[in-house]
């Protein structure tokens, strides 16, 4: 047999290494609708490794942007031209002008090109201390992408035209242990031909019965089933456990939630057992945790609440979206639970207009956690994932954690919250919540584009400030929230007296004269809000006493429900660790520039790259 030439052996080894590298990227996202641009990435110590697989023989652009556009973005452009690789670190200014970075922080590992595709693999440190680079954190990031059929140098900076876009991702979401759906049974909870009204916000509720199991099983994965072309219509889905005293008669109908004619059975469904929001994908439970079904303590009847967002008032929409739950008789060690924490959704939560930033806080108080955990789990519960939830005015959300007056590391955060991308964040390390701890859901809003008050409520034009904590082992605590005192808020704008007893909602103001016979909502809108008044009001509401919500399943309550509490006094705020920057380090790589050159030249003779390019 004729021996292989050394360069052929080398080429085979390199291509094999490239294919193996593709399998080492645990995260994958298709960035465009035509599946022409595929992003793979993975954490490598203090850096992030990327692999781009794009259907073009020209340049490929990739970037990180605060707002999803080209202005003030961190960009890298690369490709293979004439058998030689190129990869350049760029940035854009506020006018979207592309400029080469003096400090090159993206490091090429390898590049390949065939008759249809270009593959680029490169890395970058999370923190470079380059003012032209965007730090990579656990927050949402708007990934921007573009490509062209020509390389960058052929005719200057070729405009990418329509082959561009943006997608929100969480690049540092920890790797999760996937389960093979083929090995699991599943059942679907989906709406059946729901007529979505031609109004901006609809909450539709439908009862379901969990398929009867004769022994305990664990749900290990939940996937959204969103009807095609309804990805922007279905804003979120909540699944509630209902009273075990119901019977099959409740299954015959769906109805608008929170409606005066809503069926009485809906009021028995208070315990959230799963939450999905727009932009999110399926959720896989950790290997040691599952959602229990099949026992007397588990949900038999569930209520699925679907939030439809129809701002264009489109008529004739029919929806069949829902959830798919995968389950197994092979039990995990722990049962999962969900706690809804934050601000109770209410008109008592309000935000003045014209504010560049306004902060609201929802408290899961030490009194509630002391009572509930002290009775059910004195050694604490373990949080493994968090979903942070707000609406259109939301800009950032933090879940703060306090113990004995000392602030702990943030439980979860998103400094670049995207209303259109809300999913459970897997925590890098599980966090223990102990009796007597405090949790604060801190939401940052911007209302610079609004001329009237923004109110807490169900519409996406209203606001929420909530966190959904996935934890184990399951205890009898479903909601841990707060409502700020409304009367002190009204005193800020000069309200002196309201009509009592309260017979209408919103209640009516009696004095002073300028607000007489106005509802408190009308009075707040009538007040002349300035930025300075808004700042003073914000300082006030963060110090107000609050009404505590501390709920069990089946509409039961812990004894502290309805009592008054005060925000915690923080003796020792958490000090973040200093950022260590690196711009010169590169991921360990066995491919030298000389070896890479062989790949660049030889790859042009390869018909395709096998399974790594689709």
UniProtKB/Swiss-Prot annotation:
GO molecular-function term, one example from the UniProt record: dopamine beta-monooxygenase activity
Cofactor: Cu(2+)
Signal peptide: 1-22
Location in or out of the cell: Endoplasmic reticulum membrane
Enzyme class: oxidoreductase
Disulfide bonds: 205-257, 242-269, 364-480, 368-550, 443-465
Residue positions the entry lists as glycosylated: 114, 247, 476, 517
Residues annotated as catalytic: 203, 389
Binding annotation for Cu cation A: 235-236, 307
Keyword set includes Metal-binding: yes
Pfam family, one: DOMON
Keyword Endoplasmic reticulum: yes
Domain DOMON: 35-148
InterPro entries: Cu2_ascorb_mOase-like_C (IPR014784), Cu2_ascorb_mOase_N (IPR000323), Cu2_ascorb_mOase_N_sf (IPR036939), Cu2_monoox_C (IPR024548), DBH-like (IPR000945), DOH_DOMON (IPR045266), DOMON_domain (IPR005018), PHM/PNGase_F_dom_sf (IPR008977)
Membrane-topology descriptor: Single-pass type I membrane protein
Any single GO BP term: norepinephrine biosynthetic process
Binding-site list for Cu cation B: 389, 391, 464
Lumenal side: 23-592
Keywords linked to the UniProt accession: Copper, Disulfide bond, Endoplasmic reticulum, Glycoprotein, Membrane, Metal-binding, Monooxygenase, Oxidoreductase, Signal, Transmembrane, Transmembrane helix
Family the entry assigns: Belongs to the copper type II ascorbate-dependent monooxygenase family.
PANTHER family: DBH-LIKE MONOOXYGENASE PROTEIN 1, DOPAMINE BETA HYDROXYLASE RELATED
Name of this protein: DBH-like monooxygenase protein 1
């Amino acid at each position: 047999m004729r021996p292989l030439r050394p360069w052929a052996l080398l080429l085979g080894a390199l291509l094999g290494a490239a294919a193996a590298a593709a399998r080492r990227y645990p995260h994958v996202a298709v960035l465009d609708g035509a599946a022409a641009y595929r992003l793979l990435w993975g954490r490598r110590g203090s850096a992030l490794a990327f692999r781009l697989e794009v259907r073009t023989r020209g340049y490929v652009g990739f970037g990180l942007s605060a707002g999803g556009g080209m202005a003030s973005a961190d960009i890298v452009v690369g490709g293979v031209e004439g058998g030689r690789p190129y990869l350049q670190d760029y940035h854009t200014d506020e006018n979207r002008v592309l400029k080469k970075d003096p400090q090159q922080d993206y490091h090429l590992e390898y590049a390949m090109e065939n008759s249809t595709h270009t593959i680029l693999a490169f890395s970058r440190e999370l923190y470079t201390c380059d003012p032209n680079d965007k730090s990579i954190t656990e927050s949402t990031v708007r990934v921007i992408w573009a490509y062209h059929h020509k390389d960058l140098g052929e005719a200057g900076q070729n405009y990418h035209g329509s082959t561009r876009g943006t997608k929100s991702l969480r690049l540092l979401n920890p790797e999760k242990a996937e389960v093979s759906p083929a090995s699991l049974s599943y059942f679907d909870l989906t709406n059946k031909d729901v007529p979505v009204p031609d109004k901006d916000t609809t909450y539709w509720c439908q009862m379901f019965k969990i398929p009867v199991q004769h022994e305990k099983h664990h749900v290990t994965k939940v996937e959204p089933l969103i009807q095609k072309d309804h990805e922007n219509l279905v804003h979120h889905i909540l699944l509630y456990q209902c009273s075990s005293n119901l019977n099959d008669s409740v299954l015959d109908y769906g109805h608008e939630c929170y409606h005066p004619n809503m069926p009485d059975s809906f009021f028995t469904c208070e315990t959230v057992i799963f939450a999905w929001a727009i932009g999110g994908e399926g959720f896989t439970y950790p290997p040691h945790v599952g959602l229990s079904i099949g026992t007397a303590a588990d949900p038999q009847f569930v209520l699925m609440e679907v939030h439809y967002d129809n701002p264009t008032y489109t008529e004739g929409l029919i929806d069949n979206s829902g959830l798919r739950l995968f389950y197994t008789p092979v039990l995990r060690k722990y049962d999962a639970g969900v706690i809804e924490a934050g601000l109770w959704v209410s008109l008592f939560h309000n935000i003045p207009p014209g504010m560049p930033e306004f902060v609201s806080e929802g408290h899961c108080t030490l009194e509630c956690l002391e009572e509930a955990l002290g009775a059910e789990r004195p050694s604490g519960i373990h949080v493994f994932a968090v979903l942070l939830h707000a609406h259109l005015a939301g800009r950032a959300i933090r879940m703060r954690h306090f113990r004995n007056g000392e602030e702990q590391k943030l439980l979860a955060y998103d400094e670049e919250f995207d209303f259109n991308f809300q999913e459970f964040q897997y925590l890098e390390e599980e966090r223990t919540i102990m009796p007597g701890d405090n949790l604060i859901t801190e939401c940052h809003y911007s209302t610079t584009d609004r001329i009237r008050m923004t109110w807490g409520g169900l519409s996406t034009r209203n606001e929420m400030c909530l966190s959904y904590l996935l934890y184990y082992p399951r205890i009898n605590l479903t909601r841990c929230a707060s409502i700020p005192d409304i009367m002190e808020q009204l005193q800020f704008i000069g309200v002196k007296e309201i009509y009592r007893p309260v017979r209408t909602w919103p209640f009516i103001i009696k004095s002073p004269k300028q607000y007489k016979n106005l509802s408190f909502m009308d009075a707040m809108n009538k007040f002349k809000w300035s930025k300075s008044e808004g700042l003073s009001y914000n300082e006030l509401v963060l110090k107000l006493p609050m009404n505590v919500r501390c709920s069990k399943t089946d509409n039961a309550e812990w004894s502290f429900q309805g009592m008054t509490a005060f925000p915690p006094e923080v003796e020792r705020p958490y000090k973040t660790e200093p950022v260590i920057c690196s711009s010169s380090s590169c991921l360990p790589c066995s491919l030298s520039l000389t070896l890479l050159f062989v790949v660049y030249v030889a790859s042009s003779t390869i018909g395709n790259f096998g399974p790594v390019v689709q």
